[in-house]
């Protein structure tokens, strides 16, 4: 099953098992996901569900967005997300339908995608876990520098993709095979074991694990 949901990271806490074992969990609020468009092979060339969730101020909605939401008869949400469907998935789901966290009731593990926390401009040691150079023994300037980044006159350049200093974080990250600890349908909460990408209140895409 590839149908997933959009949630919001509430934060982390812990729960205790009957044996008294402490389990760190991330609490994800999964409010109703409203279907705004159903894409088909005939009209779009592929099958997918487009959903929205949450709310958005009227003065923050562009005219194209307003027209799109009005056409689907769905309240404007804080964004639009699309999930591809394979043959046999999503049959019977129509525009205006609402998907809730109960679809994970029988799911053991999930993959969670979000935007990682931005760290700004960082050096090679922090960004790529490079080893530091000697703190003494004659080294007084290059303790945390990258070291050699190329060869000589041949090739006479630095290869593309070379791990160097630069902007760290603020990129799309997926954490796979997180165990579903609890599904709270009444409060629209999903508890998964461990940490998920991103900061508090960040949007998350939750899907059944592909490697489970």
Curated annotation (Swiss-Prot):
<keyword id="KW-0699">rRNA-binding</keyword>
<keyword id="KW-0689">Ribosomal protein</keyword>
<feature type="region of interest" description="Disordered">
    <location>
        <begin position="136"/>
        <end position="155"/>
    </location>
</feature>
<dbReference type="InterPro" id="IPR019927">
    <property type="entry name" value="Ribosomal_uL3_bac/org-type"/>
</dbReference>
<dbReference type="GO" id="GO:0022625">
    <property type="term" value="C:cytosolic large ribosomal subunit"/>
</dbReference>
<feature type="modified residue" description="N5-methylglutamine">
    <location>
        <position position="153"/>
    </location>
</feature>
<dbReference type="InterPro" id="IPR019926">
    <property type="entry name" value="Ribosomal_uL3_CS"/>
</dbReference>
<dbReference type="Pfam" id="PF00297">
    <property type="entry name" value="Ribosomal_L3"/>
</dbReference>
<keyword id="KW-0488">Methylation</keyword>
<dbReference type="InterPro" id="IPR009000">
    <property type="entry name" value="Transl_B-barrel_sf"/>
</dbReference>
<dbReference type="GO" id="GO:0006412">
    <property type="term" value="P:translation"/>
</dbReference>
<dbReference type="InterPro" id="IPR000597">
    <property type="entry name" value="Ribosomal_uL3"/>
</dbReference>
<comment type="subunit">
    <text>Part of the 50S ribosomal subunit. Forms a cluster with proteins L14 and L19.</text>
</comment>
<comment type="similarity">
    <text>Belongs to the universal ribosomal protein uL3 family.</text>
</comment>
<protein>
    <recommendedName>
        <fullName>Large ribosomal subunit protein uL3</fullName>
    </recommendedName>
</protein>
<dbReference type="GO" id="GO:0003735">
    <property type="term" value="F:structural constituent of ribosome"/>
</dbReference>
<keyword id="KW-0687">Ribonucleoprotein</keyword>
<dbReference type="GO" id="GO:0019843">
    <property type="term" value="F:rRNA binding"/>
</dbReference>
<comment type="function">
    <text>One of the primary rRNA binding proteins, it binds directly near the 3'-end of the 23S rRNA, where it nucleates assembly of the 50S subunit.</text>
</comment>
<keyword id="KW-0694">RNA-binding</keyword>
């Amino acid at each position: 099953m590839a149908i997933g949901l959009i949630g919001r990271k509430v934060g982390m806490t812990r729960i205790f098992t009957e044996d008294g074992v402490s389990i760190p969990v991330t609490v994800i609020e999964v409010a109703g996901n409203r279907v705004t468009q159903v894409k088909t092979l005939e009209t779009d060339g592929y099958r997918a569900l487009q959903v929205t969730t949450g709310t958005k101020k009227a003065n923050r909605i562009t005219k194209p967005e307003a027209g799109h939401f009005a056409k689907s008869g769905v309240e404007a949400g804080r964004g639009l997300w699309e999930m591809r469907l394979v043959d046999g998935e999503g049959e019977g789901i129509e525009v205006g339908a609402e998907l809730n966290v109960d679809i994970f009731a029988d799911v053991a593990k999930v993959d969670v995608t979000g935007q990682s926390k931005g760290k700004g401009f960082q050096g090679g040691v922090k960004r790529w876990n490079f080893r530091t150079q000697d703190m003494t023994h004659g080294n007084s300037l290059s303790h945390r520098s990258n070291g050699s980044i190329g060869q000589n006159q041949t090739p006479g350049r630095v290869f593309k993709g070379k791990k160097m200093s630069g902007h760290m974080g603020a990129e799309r990250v997926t954490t796979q095979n997180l165990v579903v600890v609890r599904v709270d349908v009444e409060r629209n909460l999903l508890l998964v074991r461990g940490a998920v990408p991103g900061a508090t209140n960040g949007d998350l895409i939750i899907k059944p694990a592909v490697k489970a």
